[in-house]
């Protein structure tokens, strides 16, 4: 559902959320909004059906998936320093956070 919403945005300029697509499928949107979405979904479905016959286009469709953010990793030493600091001062001010960040770089 999220991929459908993203594909609609890529092709037609309107990104629709996973929730919207889900509610469309469950007929839980207003009649007016359903009438707005139906032509876009029909057009997308026809284009998708016609392009999936070619193996080259399958790669393009797969490449349209959402890009995920990389997982943040913190070095062991930095993690220890942060944990020690927050044990001493659980609610640091913005200035203290900035100073701590500068000292850890």
Swiss-Prot record:
Its main location: nucleus. Residues 67-105 bind DNA. This is Homeotic protein NRL-19. Keywords: Activator, DNA-binding, Homeobox, Nucleus, Transcription, Transcription regulation. PROSITE patterns: POU_2, POU_3. One of its GO terms (biological process) is regulation of transcription by RNA polymerase II. It comes from the Eukaryota. The keyword Transcription applies. One of its GO terms (molecular function) is RNA polymerase II cis-regulatory region sequence-specific DNA binding. Residues 1-49 form the POU-specific domain. Belongs to the POU transcription factor family. Class-3 subfamily. It is found in: Nucleus. It comes from Xenopus laevis (African clawed frog). One of its GO terms (cellular component) is nucleus. It holds the Pfam family Homeodomain.
């Amino acid at each position: 559902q999220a991929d459908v919403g993203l594909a609609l945005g890529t092709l037609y300029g309107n990104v629709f959320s996973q929730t919207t697509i889900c509610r469309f499928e469950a007929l839980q949107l207003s009649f007016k909004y359903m009438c707005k979405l139906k032509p876009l979904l029909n057009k997308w479905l026809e284009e998708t059906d016609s392009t999936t016959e070619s193996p080259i286009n399958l790669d393009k469709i797969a490449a349209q998936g959402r890009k995920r953010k990389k997982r943040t990793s913190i070095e062991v030493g930095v993690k220890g320093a942060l944990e020690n600091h927050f044990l001493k001062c659980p609610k640091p001010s913005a200035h203290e956070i900035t100073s701590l960040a500068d000292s850890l770089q």
